[in-house]
Amino acid sequence: MAPSAEILCIGTELLLGQIVNTNAQFLAVELAKLGIPHHFQTVVGDNPGRIRLALDIAIERAGIILTTGGLGPTDDDLTHQTLAEHFEVPLVRHPALLALIEERFRERNRPMSPTNAKQADLPEGAQILPNPMGTAPGIVWEPKAGVAILTFPGVPAEMRAMWAETAVPFLRLRGGGQEIFHSRTLRHWGVSESTLAEKVEEFLRGVNPTVAPYAGNGEVKLRITARAAGIAAAESLIAPVEASLRTIAGLDCYGADEDTLASASAALLVRTGTTLAVAESCTGGMLAEALTALPGASRYLRGAVVAYANDLKTSLLGVDEQRMIDHGAVSEPVARAMAEGVRNRLASDWGLALTGVSGPGGGTAQKPVGLVHIALAGPGETRAVEIRLGAQRGRDWIRRVSTQSALDLLRREIINWEAFGIMKER
């Protein structure tokens, strides 16, 4: 059986919540790919005593310890110094490593501070874990029988490069797991976690593969995880479960893994050879940004209009002024007029529009913060939906979820139009 691993992330900024700990997430996924079990993650500040305490605990329960952070040149970068003190060995300066660090500074035409020299000081007996992107090398060290320590800088890009080039080969040679864990994540929109869990309850009791639901930012994910001798074997276990789950979810499932509602909608536009124009008010360009962030957006996106002011809704989109007086700018009739106007004026097949109250101010009893109207004009009738998101989660969340909801409306209607030649009611 492969030794288990523990992830030890060092940095006071992590404890204070100033930086999101993406390194731990990355390492957890990579360990699973290698079939190396890991049961604990620890975050500790830049304090030698507490780092040593965390090491003591980790050594008792794991044979592989992966640390991130604390490899820089400043006084609070203490990882290698603390490791050396903990195992009672001296720090040894590596002249070749120091020369490499100096060369990095010359390449960047920057002066090297004397404090950077300490990055060439490593615990005696440790092997250098090269950093192809920065000046902070890590180490691969087996300070005692049954314990391997690998250190990485806290900068995610540097840590990932070092992981792929040096750490993975070392861990594979060390034995890796006889089995690997492989996952597929199905992504859903327009359904609650509890409702989806009820529909797939039978699969949640599975053992291999397992199925686990989790929700966030308006969407629900189903993670299917298989344990097998290799990726191909794991895929063969996942495939039939994935097919069944997709059938049960129907249109609520929009993709898997790295798919987004924007990419799913874009793929449908490309497949159907149709074009899109968008008109935004409350989202302020977020919908257009989601679409243009994808390569090849010019194939399907005609353009976008951000019309915040009411007079611009009239002059740019052709929304009748009296309609806004009668119904208000945040209303279904205005959303419909915006969608139809942008479709006509930008000569696109589809026109998608949003208008709403993002907050924190501007809401009323009749039109509270979080009220958003979305409309889609297309080859058939114009469709409109109203969503109420509440004010509790804040302006940015309302704008992001509104954007995703608009893309979901577009996705569903294109699928219906492609299948039936008409736009169907949801």
Swiss-Prot record:
Gene3D superfamilies: 3.30.70.2860, CinA-like, MoaB/Mog-like domain. SUPFAM superfamilies: CinA-like, Molybdenum cofactor biosynthesis proteins. Disulfide bonds: none annotated. SMART domains: MoCF_biosynth. It comes from the Bacteria. InterPro entries: CinA, CinA-like_C, CinA_C, CinA_KH, Competence-induced_CinA, MoaB/Mog-like_dom_sf, MoaB/Mog_dom. Signal peptide: none annotated. HAMAP family: CinA_B. Belongs to the CinA family. This is CinA-like protein. It comes from Gloeobacter violaceus (strain ATCC 29082 / PCC 7421).
